[in-house]
Amino acid sequence: MASRSPSSSPDSATGSGTDPARPDTGEPLGGGSDSDSDFGLGKFDCSAGDASARLEGADLENEFESAADRVRDLVQTASREQLLYLYARFKQVKVGKCNTSKPGFFDFEGQRKWSAWKQLGDMSAEQAMQEYVTCVHALDPEGSQKSSERRGGEKRTGFGGPAVSSLYQEEKIREEDKNIFDYCRENNIEHVSKAISSKTVDVNTRDEEGRALLHWACDRGHKDLVSLLLQNNADINSQDDEGQTALHYASACEFAEIVELLLKAGADPSIKDQEGSLPEEVTESSAISSLLRQYTAPKG
């Protein structure tokens, strides 16, 4: 499975442009499991007798906002796993239950953040605030009195406070520096179409990791762009350097409509990647798995 993230989403909070609830792919948070026990937080008992557990209503909200301000002072000492823990709970407070689709297959870091948020399920905002505050207190037992002085001085970005947010700002790509893969990622159908029709770009051109435009379009969920590429004879079964086809990407990202589009266009669901995984084995969607099996089953 790909563990790189060559693309990143532009939203400063969590990615995907104007969508404030999709994790982006800024500076990596680190590897390992997404479970809290593996975030270096086992010593943080969020149900213990922390002062925040006794707070309610406005008092708890004020303590939470204060803790969010204090995070800026902890960036150099907290691990990326701990920042991820805080990120998930901040999102739970500000947005609620994870309500976005899984990030793109290339977007490894975004998937980690998305998974951390999603695993909180129906956790209440109150519990998320308490756990957030408890974690910050554990990281900074003495507390930071400076936070109250500067609260309101900076606009909060919605990514766990200004400090956490600053780690994930996407570097803006100047127009003159963009390549065809950037336009594909942006779903700039007009530009991609002109580049292909004018022969400026081969529809099957690959990036440094062997990913074709079709891989990128499927990864980002751009159905219309996928259709355009197929109409221009994109190699539907092209494999990247890890042996993954566009069908692997669409399946892993759980874009059911694109999976169906690819299958109807002749994509081969029996192709395995270098790890021996079929497209149906890289998705968590039972509906997509079922669809893939229908096309894999011998006809007779």
Swiss-Prot record:
Residues annotated as domain ACB: 60-145
Residues holding an acyl-CoA: 87-91, 113, 132
Transmembrane feature ranges: none
Effects seen without this gene: Knockout animals, generated by CRISP-Cas technology, show an exaggerated response after lights are turned off, a reduced locomotor activity in dark period, light-induced seizure-like behavior, and excessive axonal arborizations and progressive degeneration of muscle fibers. Brain size is significantly reduced compared to controls, and musculature is disrupted. Proteomics analysis shows increased protein N-myristoylation in crispant animals.
Bias kind Low complexity: ranges: 1-19
Domain of life (superkingdom): Eukaryota
Protein name from the UniProt record: Acyl-CoA-binding domain-containing protein 6
Gene source species: Danio rerio (Zebrafish)
